[in-house]
Amino acid sequence: MAPALVSEALSRLGLHQAYALVADHALRRAGQDRLSFFSLDLHRDAASRVKVYVSHDDAGVRSALLAAAAVPSANPDLVRAFCALLGEGISVFGGRPLISSYTFTEANAAAPATYSLYLPIRAFVPDDQTARDRVRALLDRHGIDRSVFDRALAEVSDRELRDGVGLIPHVALRTGTVRPGITVYLSAEAYSTTPARARFDQLAHA
């Protein structure tokens, strides 16, 4: 059902080749690659965005590289380094999926303008101190001032970072012709904090 709906939606928006491109590059593993989200800007001009998200269960870097190859201007070296820095020592990202996102515009209907890769870092670290250190290393590699990230993290929570995991749930890499960069997502932990040791034990016995 979802593939047909997404294909039809893209066609109605004038992006007639978009679904085939997404399927060829990101929906390659039956039962493991799946459409997750579909979004669009609610205004009409040539720069209005249509975005398609694909989740990759139990995926390695190769799946991300194949997905990124749909965008001619995407940098595969950035994708490799992103996965290596945040998923230190991990060859298969299990438990929580990697997520690919494609941004299409009417002005560039033949191919996506950008490719984004979302990595659920909380699933692959023992605690938020480790997550913070890996994010800092990533920001340094991209020449981004880490002080903004540090201030935001301090404002969101005053607990010891080594005492929990999940304060930094996802990190995203955006590569392509439109505003390449890094996005770091923070959680308010409004209901509870996942204990660091509990999370580590779950990973060890997964």
Map each language-model feature to its residues.
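Extended, well-ordered protein cores
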Residues: 1-15, 19-51, 55-57, 70
